[in-house]
């Protein structure tokens, strides 16, 4: 696995325990980093870059979404890169923060008929790609980012999250 320094904060009691989440996230994000390094030639710092993960609830993520994006509603995942980085370029020693809302994750997983863990995996990969400079503000960016998500998830044994879905990640 590629080394990442993963820091976790659990702010909602409905989430699994911190040790369980840390182990899960190390597996998912480690696999994503290895895929990006080996298949996409994504450079990483020699020292393990830090990723901060916050597992919260809809109310908290709604407040953050309103403050930072001007969207006063809950969302599934928010990512805040620590430093500006272009896709495929060397990131800084701190990648940034990924914040995930439990209730939205649970609701979407049920709607998509996916397990909690499978949808959490997708949201972690999606957020991680944002920290590395990928985005989906237009169709060209979305095609690249969603293609990477699909290939990384396939490495983890998961199907294409966008296949047959009209649900795309909102900008």
Swiss-Prot record:
Q: What is its EC number?
A: 3.1.-.-
Names of required cofactors = Zn(2+)
GO cellular component terms, A-Z: cytoplasm
The UniProt keywords, alphabetically, are: Cytoplasm, Endonuclease, Hydrolase, Metal-binding, Nuclease, Ribosome biogenesis, rRNA processing, Zinc
**Co-factor binding details:** Binds 1 zinc ion.
Where located? Cytoplasm
Main function: Single strand-specific metallo-endoribonuclease involved in late-stage 70S ribosome quality control and in maturation of the 3' terminus of the 16S rRNA.
List the PANTHER family hit by this protein, alphabetically: ENDORIBONUCLEASE YBEY, CHLOROPLASTIC
This chain belongs to which protein, by name? Answer: Endoribonuclease YbeY
Q: Which organism is it from?
A: Rhizobium johnstonii (strain DSM 114642 / LMG 32736 / 3841) (Rhizobium leguminosarum bv. viciae)
Top-level taxonomy: Bacteria, Pseudomonadati, Pseudomonadota, Alphaproteobacteria, Hyphomicrobiales
